[in-house]
Amino acid sequence: MSQSRHRAAAPPMEREDSGTFSLGKMITAKPGKTPIQVLHEYGMKTKNIPVYECERSDVQIHVPTFTFRVTVGDITCTGEGTSKKLAKHRAAEAAINILKANASICFAVPDPLMPDPSKQPKNQLNPIGSLQELAIHHGWRLPEYTLSQEGGPAHKREYTTICRLESFMETGKGASKKQAKRNAAEKFLAKFSNISPENHISLTNMVGHSLGCTWHSLRNSPGEKINLLKRSLLSIPNTDYIQLLSEIAKEQGFNITYLDIEELSANGQYQCLAELSTSPITVCHGSGISCSSAQSDAAHNALQYLKIIAERK
């Protein structure tokens, strides 16, 4: 959708005498030019450089809407689109149509955010950027991507990436790290797009209150398990550190994810990462002679870290 208004009567813009130019001929001679490029060239020749201003930026969960205003001399037009680029294109197109005084001149400007899935190549979309814009708009923390697994033969590698956004998590797989990351972001966008508009507020509230365990809440918690941790030496033989960490997580309201690392350490031991969904997120490394012992070591290190944080004043 585009709108236009005149500040004053537009002067004739299409003169064929020597020393001047024809806007129509400019468009015909350079069919590959976008409306923005054509309008800019016109502005250069007439010494009326187009000026663009963003009037509205409404980023919704389903479809964002942008409105841009362009001023060329005495003419002002606006254009709307689901991206800033598209809105500017439509504003420039509207201005060109007025300058030509011929509404039949129309540039084909595809809407990049409303594609036909059967015809739109995936590489033209940017789910990672869209998810980041969504998070910024709602005041959420930015999405975090973690490469959790890499496998398969050299000629057919497969990567697995975990994407976390507040308390939500999605997993993406692909033949490259970038593709796995994109797939994870796409899953998030698909999840949010299935939420009806009336539930947007409740979703925002749910995410906004999903910060879980913060350092402040940990230090001031009256919980039995966390206070027991403060008094523990964490050096008693045969202690089940994984179970102890699980009990504290349940009490304090955070989740634990163990990520086994395929590569052995420099001294030939198994490796593991324990990720705690605290705020900020905590990641602790562990190693051992087996996967289970590496997980136990990671849990032990996580407990030591939580103990240090909880004891701080």
UniProtKB/Swiss-Prot annotation:
CDD domains hit by this protein: DSRM_PRKRA_rpt1 (cd19889), DSRM_PRKRA_rpt2 (cd19891), DSRM_PRKRA_rpt3 (cd19892)
Region Disordered: start-end pairs: 1-21
Keyword RNA-binding: yes
Record region (Sufficient for self-association and interaction with TARBP2): 1-103, 102-195, 195-313
Any single biological process term in GO: outer ear morphogenesis
Location of the protein in the cell: Cytoplasm, Perinuclear region; Cytoplasm
Residues where Phosphoserine is found: S18, S167, S246, S287
Domain DRBM: 34-101, 126-194, 240-308
A single Gene Ontology CC term: RISC complex
Chief site of localization: cytoplasm
Record PTM: Phosphorylated at Ser-246 in unstressed cells and at Ser-287 in stressed cells. Phosphorylation at Ser-246 appears to be a prerequisite for subsequent phosphorylation at Ser-287. Phosphorylation at Ser-246 and Ser-287 are necessary for activation of EIF2AK2/PKR under conditions of stress.
Family named by the database record: Belongs to the PRKRA family.
Function: Activates EIF2AK2/PKR in the absence of double-stranded RNA (dsRNA), leading to phosphorylation of EIF2S1/EFI2-alpha and inhibition of translation and induction of apoptosis. Required for siRNA production by DICER1 and for subsequent siRNA-mediated post-transcriptional gene silencing. Does not seem to be required for processing of pre-miRNA to miRNA by DICER1. Promotes UBC9-p53/TP53 association and sumoylation and phosphorylation of p53/TP53 at 'Lys-386' at 'Ser-392' respectively and enhances its activity in a EIF2AK2/PKR-dependent manner.
Subunit structure, interactors included: Homodimer. Interacts with EIF2AK2/PKR through its DRBM domains. Interacts with DICER1, AGO2 and TARBP2. Also able to interact with dsRNA. Interacts with UBC9. Forms a complex with UBC9 and p53/TP53. Interacts with DUS2L (via DRBM domain).
Entry domain remark: Self-association may occur via interactions between DRBM domains as follows: DRBM 1/DRBM 1, DRBM 1/DRBM 2, DRBM 2/DRBM 2 or DRBM 3/DRBM3.
UniProt-recorded name of the protein: Interferon-inducible double-stranded RNA-dependent protein kinase activator A
